[in-house]
Amino acid sequence: MATKEPESVYELSIEDAKGNNLALSQYKDKVLLIVNVASKCGMTNSNYTELNELYNRYKDKGLEILAFPCNQFGDEEPGTNDQITDFVCTRFKSEFPIFNKIEVNGENASPLYKFLKKGKWGIFGDDIQWNFAKFLVDKNGQAVQRYYPTTSPLTLEHDIKNLLNIS
């Protein structure tokens, strides 16, 4: 019997950095920025700094940033979940949630990333190309935009404000 494909991210569950199962439905009616992150990437400092800025600016207006460590690109996220969380929270003082380390491509890709990538993105196919690829998800749980890893988080502000209905 075939498994029913999810129709929104809210139908999926994920694991937090402590291994607890969390339903994404807890983020219903929020705008989500979902990012695959790495601690040892050349883009780490700029991305975390700008993600923090966006989060601090819009968290009270309905934005949630979900960060998913991934070690599939150049072994740039080799640490344990505890090491990763400690690094992000200590070095960058990030307050947005950091989740369990996942894979974003291949057979073992997280169901969340399989849903996000499904069929409508990327000139090189659906695969994530590197660390810090970003997906913007609307309040209905639909991925409405995908941004390349090199896209500065602050350049997403206009799109985020539109989804939050902020002029």
Curated annotation (Swiss-Prot):
It catalyses: 2 glutathione + H2O2 = glutathione disulfide + 2 H2O. GO terms for molecular function: glutathione peroxidase activity; peroxidase activity. CDD domains: GSH_Peroxidase. Pfam families: GSHPx. One of its GO terms (cellular component) is nucleus. GO terms for biological process: response to oxidative stress. Keywords: Oxidoreductase, Peroxidase. Its EC number is 1.11.1.9. It comes from the Eukaryota. InterPro entries: Glutathione_peroxidase, GPX_AS, GPX_CS, Thioredoxin-like_sf. May constitute a glutathione peroxidase-like protective system against oxidative stresses. PANTHER family: GLUTATHIONE PEROXIDASE (PTHR11592), GLUTATHIONE PEROXIDASE 8-RELATED (PTHR11592:SF27). This is Probable glutathione peroxidase 8. It comes from Arabidopsis thaliana (Mouse-ear cress).
